[in-house]
Amino acid sequence: MRLIIVSGRSGSGKSTALDVLEDNGFYCIDNLPAGLLPDLAERALLNTEMLLPQVAVSIDARNLQSHLRRFPELLEQVRQRNIRCDILYLDADDETLLKRFSETRRRHPLTDENRSLAEAIADETQVLAPIVDLADLKIDTTHLNLYQLRDSLKLRLLNQPEPGTAFLFESFGFKRGMPVDADLVFDARCLPNPYWKPELRDFSGLQQPVIDYLAAQPEVEEMYQDILAYLEKWLPRFAASNRAYVTIAIGCTGGHHRSVYLANRLSQALKKPLKNVQVRHRDLS
């Protein structure tokens, strides 16, 4: 049995996550009281009429805070039943969450006559601390639209042909902010920039003209070899520590050329030794 627990601050995309999982064969339960987690696991395993190989539940700030404080204990009870359990935590920056609530005009679960929306959003971080501290996978949805979020969820949660640690190589542009869910970040902005070559500007780091240009630059090759040597040594240690997900982010200014080239090349080089390797280009439209 596989169980995915979806959590995160209100407005971060939990409903979308459940929709994606339901569309891919998961039995989904929204707003499950955390105290019922062990009972749900037991019933799903033992009741032949309720044999559910894939279950997803959302647990968030709508829960009793006393149940949320017990979350580590409840999770341990589930994992003692030899259930594969992943915790997905979605979040976005405060400004983005405020904007989303303003657009939908929905009520935040923590607002009341003494607590404004901005205060509720800030307080929710503390309320969910017992869950976020145990999250296997964190996704920052600040810069993701609905379709990008759905694609990201499919890539990280559903596209895992091999058991063990899933390694995501993600390119990004610093001008849109660093991915807060990255475990390792490498900065490629010091490398020669194809953007300043008019004949290369409209190509991406996945296309041959840019690939040929960057492959011919000694600094690019030197950085690639240095990063590759580091990752070859240390990523197996991440896997040995039973990490479910590791994100390696490579950034350049716009996220179109240098970071894309390096992320793609590194993912190809490490695909065989690491087995479960994925690649995503955050800012490549």
Curated annotation (Swiss-Prot):
InterPro entries: P-loop_NTPase, RapZ-like, RapZ-like_N, RapZ_C. Gene3D superfamilies: P-loop containing nucleotide triphosphate hydrolases. Pfam families: PapZ_C, RapZ-like_N. One of its GO terms (molecular function) is GTP binding. SUPFAM superfamilies: P-loop containing nucleoside triphosphate hydrolases (SSF52540). ATP binds at G8, R9, S10, G11, S12, G13, K14, S15. Keywords: ATP-binding, GTP-binding, Nucleotide-binding. GTP binds at D60, A61, R62, N63. It comes from the Bacteria. Displays ATPase and GTPase activities. NCBIfam families: PRK05416.1. HAMAP family: RapZ_like (MF_00636). Belongs to the RapZ-like family. This is Nucleotide-binding protein Pmen_0867. It comes from Ectopseudomonas mendocina (strain ymp) (Pseudomonas mendocina).
